Amino acid sequence: MFALPVRKFHEPYYERKPSHAKKINGVYQTLTTAGMEVEDGIRKAKELLKENVNPELMRRALGIYLIHSRDAQRRKIVVPPLMSHVSFLSNRSIPPQTVSTTAGPTVVAGEVVTADTFQGPALLSYWREDYDLNDFHYYWHMMFPGTTVNVGGENIKLMDRPGEHFLQIVSQMVARYETEGLCWNLPLVRPWNQYDDILEHGYVPVPGLIEYYGGYPPFSSWYSVRNPDIPDLPQVDVSRKQMETWRDNIYEAIKNGYFWGKKQGTNAERTPLPLTPDNCMDLVGSVVDAEYLTLPPSPDGLSVDGDLYGNLHNYGHGNFAEISYQNYPTKAAQYGLMISNFGALRDPCFWPWHKHIQYFRRLASAKFPQDITAHRAHVRLSSLVICPQRKSTSISREDGITAFLGPPALNLLESKAKIGHEPYQWSVDIQSTRSSPPSEDSPQALTLRLFIAAGDLVNDYHSWIEMDRVTVHLTSKSTLTKVRLDTDSSIARKMGSYSELDPKSTSPWDRCRWPQHMMLPVGKVEGMPFVAFCMATDDTTAPRTRVPNSNTFEAIQSDQRLSDPLGMGYPFNRAWVQDVMDNAGKASIRQIISDAQTYPFMTTTTFRIFRATKMFQDSILNPYIPPASVTWFNTIKDYFLESDKTCMLYAYGYDLGNYDHVRLHSGAILDATSSKRMPLQMSPWSQENPDPNHPLWTPEMCDTFRAWMLNGCPKGTDSA
């Protein structure tokens, strides 16, 4: 059923069209009322498909059903991976009906494209088109379908603070994407704050998706009203002016400290619903994503006035998807990838739009600054280290961690490369400072929170990437060294690449974490500096909000490890009093987190991420790191013998004793020397049996020459 294609006779269905939400809710409720067992829902789904229900609609409804069915959870029946989708099966080299959904990826070795080839968003296509990243996003939207799940006529709230979760996942995706761009010296993403902005770069979906989704040329923008090529369907489009009104109303609400509310079904006057430190982030996120049903009603029965604030996030998806709409006479009408959770991340326009959505989180986080000592654990942290697990391997370095770009799985619609990194670990020393020392009878519980940020982004709250969160119990005052492997992370997805399930991790939450192989940015060849930050908190100081009890969702509710009692992304979820209230103007995040004397429950360290190339699945080639001290005068000019200079001047017209000539032809020189075609050997000597007095370049000489090139061919000073 997940592999069935959409035909022309099917009534259109688009995941990101808000007006289509009733369709999905209707089909989902039909499945849930079919019976208590999964087989009942499956049989009902088959009946609906025979009645020509759109297969794309059924994929989403059935996915939500399987995730939230108590019978499916008990029997560990999981949603098929994204590779079971018709778009992936159509790209297999054998007929789709004969393909097993457990077949491994067809990894094709080939060129790994880098900044030398692509510029702008195209350079990060390998990251956006990653199979596991898109599977994570697709599954996340079925796990949290945007509102509540209806069971027996009752709306069941799946999790506490859904609006806060929404803003956190958006902010973390943007932070990781921008950091990946910095690894290639790309600028930060420009947010789509102005709705008449333009997309400077175009986009064309990968070959397997161009049959289903449209692209757009450079310098595209939203239509002011609607794309004239789209059929006139009711409740499909929202004008740019209406979107701007919703946006400005939300801005005004955050600024004023309240949203307008009213009693449903009445014409009563609007009444302010105040924002507080406890509800601000969740309320703002729920309004931006139009998750009105998830908001608890106020004691006097008021709810947020949806007419004022609309459905900004989802209609924004639709406006971008309209840009790509193409009505081919021989194909089904095509929206862009932004119309679907299936592949929206692949489209570069996803990122400026969600950088804009992140700005609502930025505004909310600045509204109520927090004291970062309020939930401190009474401990002293020190000796924070993040490093490779095994330093004896061929790719491990003493001065950092190696990430790599390897061959993509083309049949799973990956593009250009597959990102990965060597296994790493982190550790920190913990010593209790509690007035009553911890013991076996009276342990001290605390939570360690690990984040990283690019060195240039340390002072931006929303650029910190959450890496791990773990509870530790101290039973003595002695120093404890806590060591965590990368696969232990509570943030990392508990499954292997290409949807390989871990039998030990079958909770629905386990697929809602960040892909394991993408936990680290790709880094730079010469090493990119990062800061790691660890904080110890006492979470018992903040009462945990729990989802209302429901047997139907018992397995989900008992395993809400994604929730954080101190706030999603704490302590970077809100501005710090220690920062914004500093009258001297000298405080900054960098300065605060480095002050171990004032804040002993925090510690930092620096490390580097080095980029390598993985040409095949089983081999990684370490790049040569350019030594910055090599210049023309102190090293390179001595590589060329007088006979070489005479030969090249006579045969090719350029002088190997001339700096400008060598710099101009450095690429050709490196190619000839590394392939041992130069220096040219004269009889009776040969390239295979070179003259000892006129030797070929050693590998070290070739590496040094290449390093000199990568550093811009520095000339240096003539000591003579």
From Swiss-Prot:
List ligand-binding residues for Cu cation A.
Answer: H137, H141
Sites where the protein binds Cu cation B: H313
Q: What is an example of a Pfam family matching this protein? A: Hemocyanin_C
Keyword Cytoplasm attributed: no
Q: What class of enzyme is it?
A: lyase
Q: Tell me the cofactor note.
A: Binds 2 copper ions per subunit.
Q: Which UniProt keywords apply?
A: Copper, Lyase, Metal-binding
RNA-binding as a keyword of this entry, yes or no, is: no
Enzyme Commission code(s) on record:
4.1.99.-
This chain's function reads: Cyclopenase; part of the gene cluster that mediates the biosynthesis of penigequinolones, potent insecticidal alkaloids that contain a highly modified 10-carbon prenyl group. The first stage is catalyzed by the nonribosomal peptide synthetase penN that condenses anthranilic acid and O-methyl-L-tyrosine to produce 4'-methoxycyclopeptin. 4'-methoxycyclopeptin is then converted to 4'-methoxydehydrocyclopeptin by the ketoglutarate-dependent dioxygenase penM through dehydrogenation to form a double bond between C-alpha and C-beta of the O-methyltyrosine side chain.
Designated name of the protein: Cyclopenase penL
Which gene carries the instructions for this protein? penL
